[in-house]
Amino acid sequence: MTEAMKITLSTQPADARWGEKATYSINNDGITLHLNGADDLGLIQRAARKIDGLGIKHVQLSGEGWDADRCWAFWQGYKAPKGTRKVEWPDLDDVQRQELDNRLMIIDWVRDTINAPAEELGPSQLAQRAVDLISNVAGDRVTYRITKGEDLRDQGYMGLHTVGRGSERSPVLLALDYNPTGDKEAPVYACLVGKGITFDSGGYSIKQTAFMDSMKSDMGGAATVTGALAFAITRGLNKRVKLFLCCADNLISGNAFKLGDIITYRNGKKVEVMNTDAEGRLVLADGLIDASAQKPELIIDAATLTGAAKTALGNDYHALFSFDDALAGRLLASAAQENEPFWRLPLAEFHRSQLPSNFAELNNTGSAAYPAGASTAAGFLSHFVENYQQGWLHIDCSATYRKAPVEQWSAGATGLGVRTIANLLTA
C-alpha cells in the first residue's frame, strides 16, 4: 500500500509561482487546496478530480477546515467508476461523521447502481436492490410488494406491461411502504415514483448508437428516489412514505409494442403510441395512478424523461416542473440548502393539451407544432395525477449521468438530487 498523499486546506492564496489563480499547490508535505470563499465546495470538487487525474489513488484529508460538506465535495470529484481509491477521513464530530457515512453509503449506492451494466441490472434486480437498500436503513418499518410480467397486465398496469413485454426480462412494479408509525391506517405523507427503464433501445423508434450507448442509465430516476427515501430515513424521517418503481427494458422483438398501439389505463385515459422512445411517461403513468390513490400530501416523480431537458440545461441542473408554486419554491430552497442544482422550467395548463391524437385521448409525444418537449412530457404526466395542480413535483433528471468526464465529475452517475428530495421529505 502506498503512503497516503496529504490534502490540506488553506484560506491563503497559493505562492505566485503556481499562478495567479492557482487552486492547489504541491509541497513536501502534500497538496494544499487554496480556498477563496467564493465557491469553496466547487473548488474542492474540481481539485479532487485533478488529483485523481494525476494518478493519486490514496489520500489523507488532513489539518483544519474539513467538515462533512467539504469531505463530501472532495469525494464527489475523486470517485470514478473505474479503479479503486482510498480516502483517510479527518476527525469529525459524531454528527458530522454520521452524515458523511450516510452519504457515502447511500449516494454511492445510487451512483454505482446507475453505472451498472444493463446486463447485470434488469428490472427485477433493480427492484430487489431498492428493497435491500431501504430495508438496510429502515428494518422492519418497511413492507413491499413486487408485481411482474403477466400479473401486471392482469392487474391493469398496462403502460408498464406494454413497454416491458418486448424483453425476455419481465417488467416489474415495486410498491414499497415505509411506515414508521406502525399503524396500518396511518395517512401517507408522500409518494415517490421513479422511472426504472434498465435499458432503453428506443424500441421500434430506435435510437442511434450515439444516443443509445448511455441508456443503461435510463433508470436514474428510480435510483434517485430510492436513495432519497433511504437518506431521508437516516435523517429521521418519521412520516409514512410510499415508493413506486416502474421497471422495464424497452427493447425490440416480435412481442414489442408498436406505433399506433393504444394503451388504456386504469383511470380511463387512452393513449396512442406514436413514439416508442417516449416510453418513460407510459410506465410512470401507472405509478402516478397508484400514488394518487394514496391521497398523499406530496407526490414526487423522477425520471430521465426527455432529451429536451438536457438541451435546455445540459447535465448541470435537474429540471423541475410543477403547477404548485409554493411547493416548487420549497424544493428549490431544499436544493439550495443541499448545494444541488435544480432549475424550474415552464409547465402551464396549455401544455396538457399539446398531445393531440386522432384515435385516443392523448398522444404519447408532441408534434412539430408543439416543440416544448420537456414541458409537454410533464403535461402528459399530469393527466395521471388526480390533483395535479397541488402537491405534485416532476423532476426530469438531466443531471443524473454524464457520458464524458468534466472538470468536477468523472464520467457516469452523479447522485445529484438525492439530498434535495430527502431534505424536502424531512423539512
From Swiss-Prot:
Q: Which GO terms describe its molecular function?
A: manganese ion binding; metalloaminopeptidase activity
Species for this entry: Escherichia coli (strain SMS-3-5 / SECEC)
| Pfam families for this protein | DUF3663, Peptidase_M17
* Complexes and interactors: Homohexamer.
**Highest classification ranks of the organism:** Bacteria, Pseudomonadati, Pseudomonadota, Gammaproteobacteria, Enterobacterales
Family label: Belongs to the peptidase M17 family.
Q: Where does Mn(2+) 2 bind?
A: 195, 200, 218, 279
Residues forming the catalytic site: 207, 281
For Mn(2+) 1, which residues are the binding ones?
200, 277, 279
Q: What class of enzyme is it?
A: hydrolase
Record SUPFAM superfamilies: Zn-dependent exopeptidases
Entry annotated with the keyword ATP-binding: no
- Gene from which this protein is expressed: pepB
Q: Which GO terms describe its cellular component?
A: cytoplasm
Q: How is the cofactor bound?
A: Binds 2 manganese ions per subunit.
Superkingdom of the source species: Bacteria
Q: Which PANTHER family match?
A: LEUCINE AMINOPEPTIDASE-RELATED, PEPTIDASE B
This entry's Enzyme Commission designation comes to 3.4.11.23
List UniProt keywords, sorted A-Z: Aminopeptidase, Cytoplasm, Hydrolase, Manganese, Metal-binding, Protease
- Cofactor dependence: Mn(2+)
Provide a GO biological process annotation: proteolysis
What name is this protein filed under?
A: Peptidase B
